[in-house]
Regions:
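Short amphipathic alpha-helix that is part of the acyltransferase structural core
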Residues: 1, 84-116
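Conserved donor-binding loop and adjoining core beta-sheet/short helix segment
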Residues: 1-45, 136-158
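Active-site rim helix/loop that mediates acceptor-substrate recognition in acyltransferases
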Residues: 1-8, 111-137
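Acyl-donor-binding surface of acyltransferase catalytic domains
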Residues: 31-89, 203-207
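Conserved acetyl-CoA-binding loop-helix of GNAT-fold acetyltransferases
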Residues: 36-48, 158-173, 189-194
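Conserved hydrophobic beta-strand within the GNAT/NAT acetyltransferase core sheet
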Residues: 60, 151, 177-181
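Conserved active-site tyrosine of GNAT-family acetyltransferases
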Residues: 65-68, 192, 197
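Short glycine/proline-centered loop/turn elements that form peptide/ligand docking sites
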Residues: 162-163, 185-188, 206-208
């Protein structure tokens, strides 16, 4: 399902992200412009189109976000002193293992707000892009994706393995590392704060339409 960069109502213009509807039932509306005093009507019309396209949930963002949104995408940064005892074995994703990595990612991210569902078309971009399987003592403990100085994804398949995955990824680089996390993902935020990451900004606020 294709996104709509410019969706027009009688009240304004918005961008509709529909690509996640077939997989997560979620659509996103980014308000570009709106006639003053008609934000609610503009959002409602956009959300109605998204639901007609199959969305179960619709989130919107724009300039006039309420003080209490549903969730906030936060930026966090940290410069972890890597503990060698927590650095495990890394295995880069290959053409033969990309599907397995993608399925693990989608399974572990299923209940994480605003996490993208990866499709078969996404597998090519995982190759040579910093996506890894992390093993400890010969067994898989999780997956990670380090893109330059940015952690794109962390998912553990063994309880309590998140810290080891972060240490292992950060052993590949030096300096500050950044990541993005939804404010509703309290478990992940606790892990990152325990490892020394701090919130440095807000990327986007999402309200439920």
């Amino acid at each position: 399902m294709k996104d709509i960069p410019f969706f027009t109502t009688e009240y304004g213009v918005a961008s509709l992200s529909l690509g996640q509807i077939p997989y997560r039932g979620t659509a996103y509306v980014q308000v570009r412009s709106c006639v003053p005093g008609h934000l609610a009507e503009h959002v409602a019309e956009c959300a109605g189109f998204c639901r007609a396209a199959g969305a179960d949930e619709v989130f919107w963002t724009g300039e006039d976000i309420p003080e209490q949104p549903h969730s906030v995408i936060c930026e966090m940064r940290g410069c972890l002193e890597v503990n060698p005892e927590f650095v495990e074995s890394l295995f880069p994703v290959t053409e033969q293992t990309a599907t397995q990595w993608r399925k693990i990612h989608n399974d572990r991210m299923e209940n994480v707000d605003h996490a993208a569902y990866l499709t078969e078309a996404d597998e090519k971009k995982l190759l040579n892009a910093g996506a890894y399987f992390i093993h400890r003592n010969g067994g898989l403990i999780g997956i990670g994706w380090l893109d330059g100085d940015t952690i794109r994804a962390i998912a553990s398949v063994q309880p309590g393995a998140g810290g080891r995955i972060v240490h292992t990824l950060m052993s590949l680089t030096q300096g500050d590392i950044r990541l993005e996390v939804a404010s509703t993902n309290a478990r992940a935020i606790r892990l990152y704060e325990r490892l020394g990451f701090i919130k440095t900004g807000e990327i986007r606020r999402w309200c439920r339409a």
